[in-house]
Curated annotation (Swiss-Prot):
Keyword Iron: yes
Species of origin: Nitrosococcus oceani (strain ATCC 19707 / BCRC 17464 / JCM 30415 / NCIMB 11848 / C-107)
Gene that this sequence comes from: tsaD
Protein name: tRNA N6-adenosine threonylcarbamoyltransferase
PANTHER family tied to this protein: TRNA N6-ADENOSINE THREONYLCARBAMOYLTRANSFERASE (PTHR11735), TRNA N6-ADENOSINE THREONYLCARBAMOYLTRANSFERASE, MITOCHONDRIAL (PTHR11735:SF6)
GO biological process, one term: tRNA threonylcarbamoyladenosine modification
Cofactor mode of binding and number, as noted: Binds 1 Fe(2+) ion per subunit.
EC category: transferase
Cofactor(s) listed: Fe(2+)
Residues spanning the membrane: none
Binding residue positions for Fe cation: 111, 115, 298
Keyword Metal-binding listed: yes
GO cellular component term of the entry, any: cytoplasm
Length: 335
């Protein structure tokens, strides 16, 4: 089965073609980072309009890259949520319309299921069951995965997602947008011993997270020490986040008895986190899996892949369509 994937949940326009027998045939991503940089964050209306401008040309380009005509597509997968409503509607409208015109099935894909399954696109994919840490600008959660759709949420953020905390702290340090990668780069220059930030919620049982207090702690430290301390603040902030995520992952693995950990979402590209989780994996005899760096961010390949699995199982979305700003991951049907 050849599935066309469309991702428009936020500020990236991603399109891809996945073949259930041949694998990923083509993948193209357009980033809106420059468009939003002057505003310090994503402007939803601008994001929607840019998706409208870019999506159809990208679809033609990805089909050409795959060596296919639109009639060669067996199904269409589009992100149905969670995300920005206006941005989601662009991808959903185009995806549903194309599927209807071709007489092919369409499926609305959960954005975070796309991230969750993205390591399965790699040459050495994890087997089921596994524990997953999903970390992005909008989500932070620990999940057990017994098979596709069989998800149990072990813990999640009670306030800011980890990617959001990175971006907000980067904005305090005047690092521009997108802030997460800029903060990580600045942290490499920081003194790890100058400041110590608290490790939130490690002093209590459970696997939930809280990151909003770290942003406030960074702001207070900046006010006391001035901008010359920016690199040291970035280092202290990142160390606190990495320690917290690592400890929670270890707890989740010990509680579940699983020996495979998937880490996915935009923040999974953070190299300091990867180094710590690698060390933890060695200590705990746990194999840690990631998507390739290009698939850590939002992309069409993960949507095409996840959609293909559900279409092959006989699932499809009804002829009408709706999108969701919020969509609990553990409400998805098992396949």
């Amino acid at each position: 089965m050849r599935v066309l994937g469309i991702e428009t949940s936020c500020d990236e326009t991603g399109v891809a073609v996945f073949d259930s027998k041949q694998g990923l045939l083509a993948d193209i991503l357009h980033s809106q980072a420059k468009l939003h940089a002057g505003y310090g964050g994503v402007v939803p209306e601008l994001a929607s309009r840019d998706h409208i401008r870019k999506l159809l040309p990208l679809l033609r380009k990805v089909l050409n890259q795959a060596g296919l005509n639109k009639e060669d597509i067996d199904g269409v997968a589009y992100t149905g949520g969670p995300g920005l409503i206006g941005a989601l509607l662009v991808g959903a409208a185009v995806g549903r319309s194309l599927a209807w015109a071709l007489g092919k099935p369409a499926i609305a894909v959960h954005h975070m299921e796309g991230h969750l399954l993205s390591p399965l696109l790699e040459p050495n994919p994890p087997g089921f069951p596994f524990c997953a840490l999903l970390i992005s600008g909008g989500h932070t959660m620990l999940v057990t995965v017994n098979r596709i759709g069989a998800y149990r949420i072990l813990g999640e953020s009670l306030d800011d997602a980890v990617g959001e905390a990175f971006d907000k702290t980067a904005k305090l340090l005047q690092l521009g947008y997108p802030g997460g990668p800029a903060l990580a780069k600045l942290a490499e220059q920081g003194n790890p011993d100058r400041f110590y930030f608290p490790r939130p919620m490690l002093d209590r049982p459970g696997l939930n997270f809280s990151f909003s207090g770290l942003k406030t702690y960074a702001l207070n430290t900046l006010h006391k020490n001035g901008s010359e301390a920016a690199a040291d603040i970035a280092r202290a902030f990142q160390d606190a986040v990495v320690d917290t995520l690592t400890v929670k992952c270890r707890r989740a693995l010990q509680q579940t008895g699983l020996n495979r950990l998937v880490v996915a979402g935009g923040v999974s590209a953070n190299q300091a986190l990867r180094q710590r989780l690698k060390a933890m994996g060695t200590q705990e005899n746990v194999q840690v899996y990631y998507p390739r760096l290009a698939f850590c961010t939002d992309n069409g390949a993960m949507i095409a892949f996840a959609g293909c699995q559900r279409l092959l199982a006989g699932e499809q979305t009804s002829s009408g369509f709706s999108v969701r700003a919020r969509w609990p991951l553990d409400t998805l049907p098992e396949i």
